[in-house]
Amino acid sequence: MKRLVLGAAASLVLASAALAEEMRLAVTTSFHNSGLAEVLLPEIKKDLDLDVQLLVVGTGQAIRLGEAGDVDAILVHSKKAEEAFLAGGHGTRRREIMYNDFVFIGPEGDAAGIAGAEDAAEALQQIADAGAAFVSRGDDSGTHKKELSLWASAGLDAEAFGPWYRAVGAGMGAALNTASGMDAYIMSDRASWLNFGNKGGLALLFAGDPVLFNQYAYIPVNPEMHGHVKHGLAMQLEEWLVSDKAAALINGYQINGEALFVFNAKR
């Protein structure tokens, strides 16, 4: 009888340990490719007993998942799209978490000469003038939206470009692989580039223009629109993401001695 009681108690302990809370978070491919999730998720599990299931997609698709109530929160990087999401009543509030920047990558020989450009608009104009191979995400991601806005700011229409401009409809890692294989120019977030293992003959050629600022924000899905979402868990995760511990982990995350993100949440 004693063995049965002990066995039942052990089963209850095991069952309790197995029943950690779960929530679904849509994140961008650029965030996932950075490797930061592998640092944050185990600490979230340890501190909150919360399993965060990531759906890795572009910002546009992440927002559509939020609008459909298929996730509990989103972590994305396209402010205009985020504000439209909130205006439509799909999210409760937008909380800025961290930032990095976009950079222009290209062949080490830099036939278009963008390394000497004064700003991002000039760099893009030089690529277009040279007809140099350029790979675009082409996937409605935050990175793709930003790239298109930069072409437009330079007075250029990406839809009118010739065969030198290749939209691949893929995530950041796959797009970087394509650029590496083609020896082409590409715009990437800095974190994905630093964590990319197949650089080949590519190099970081241009960065530093303030227009290349890249802010990441967290938005819980509105439970009044989607009653089934786990809003309480989404809010717990938000509070963790703006904590001192999260700040230390985000600011301390480096590759080859270079920081990938800067924490800037207001608390």
Where are the regions that the model predicts?
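Positively charged n-region of N-terminal signal peptides that target proteins for export
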Residues: 1-4
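Bacterial N-terminal signal peptides
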Residues: 7-15
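Sec/Tat signal peptide C-region and signal peptidase I cleavage site
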Residues: 16-20
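Exported/periplasmic ABC-transporter solute-binding proteins
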Residues: 21-51, 55, 60, 64-70, ...
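Short, conserved active-site loops that position catalytic residues or coordinate cofactors/metal ions
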Residues: 69, 100-101
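Serine endopeptidase catalytic core focused on the charge-relay Asp
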Residues: 104
